[in-house]
Amino acid sequence: MRVDKFTLALMNRRLVLKTIWERGAINKAEIARRTGLSLPTAIKITDELLDNRIVRSCGRQEGASGKRPEMYEFAGDCYYSVGIDFAPTVLRALVMDLNGMPVAKAKRPIPVPEDADAVIQTAAELIDQLLRESGIPLHRVLGVGVGVPGILDLDQGRVLFSPNFHWEDVALLEPLGRLLLQRTSIRWPMRLENSNRAMALGEQFFGSGVGYHYFICINLGYGIGAAAIENGELCVGASGTSGELGHITVEKDGPLCTCGNNGCLEAVASGRAIAQQARNLISSGVKTRILELAGGNIERVEAKTVFAAAREQDVAALDLVRRAGEYIGIGIASYINLLDPEKIVLADGMSNESLLIGQIQKVVKIRRMRFAGRRVKLRVSNLGEYGTAIGAAAIQLKTLLRQGGLSLTKEQEEAV
């Protein structure tokens, strides 16, 4: 296949920038060696990236004999990105630099998830608050990434269907961008991504997926979802719906799911499902510590209440956790048998519950095929509750690496 000069130049810029980003401090000769480019080409591209202000000099190489070569590094701490996670009950947002270092983060509850206008208004207020608190120059913010559960139109910035929010065909990026423009007088690039895939991006760039070419990130929270990274790229699917692990059927005649199907994994093993099952047990007269730990108010029973009771060896709570872990383990074992990944990363709130994770690991070991997944590593994420927001913010870093450099507005170029 013939490649035109423009495409070849872009490919080479991507290669050099990615090498500098991955390696940290590196000299031009080493860049040429690692990329396979000629030294003159490596020098030319590095100088262009210096002019683009995304690469900078970081001194001379230590320990080198003779004239010590100049070293270069990714200037990730000079630019920032905003990420926001539209979780079903709370908005989590952060401002971070392109090295993944948060400079401000906060969260706000969502009182009425069904009210899209109110949720978007709250999101704009939260982002504006964080930008003000961070004190960073706004012209150094490259854009805003948004993670939302459900089926999305990424090009149009719309939520086609989000069962957790009960949204259908909701415009998201346009009104959010307009509200931010009113508050900050800046129109930033806005990127939309499914929350599971955003979470996987966070793991790929800054978490347990660093250095892995093929891994799966599984979201164990209010809902259940998954996303795969293969050869460094997100697996999206033909219609953008890949990774809906929570909507595989595990009980033919199981409870109704928010998606409209019956017996989905999310309907029997998610945080929301565990809490509802506990309320049903209490209402049926089962004796359990769960209600006491919820302050005697059945409406305050949450998944975390059930896990707290399970840690106290409450029989009913232990049974709920065991049952959820068994279903999730079956789902993960099926993923391993189908896809044979290098690593599986368990993320979000329930991934911190050792009783649940222990049950999942036990079931996965039993249910996976004997020769499938022999090398797969099952690990818990270290990104914490802001993992999806980190991944949403990382969309700007991914875009920068794909473009082979910064793409600044005229106002940004004049201000930098």
Explain the meaning of each model-derived region.
Residues I84, L142-G147, I151-Q276, G391, ...:
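Phosphate-binding/catalytic loop of phosphoryl-transfer enzymes
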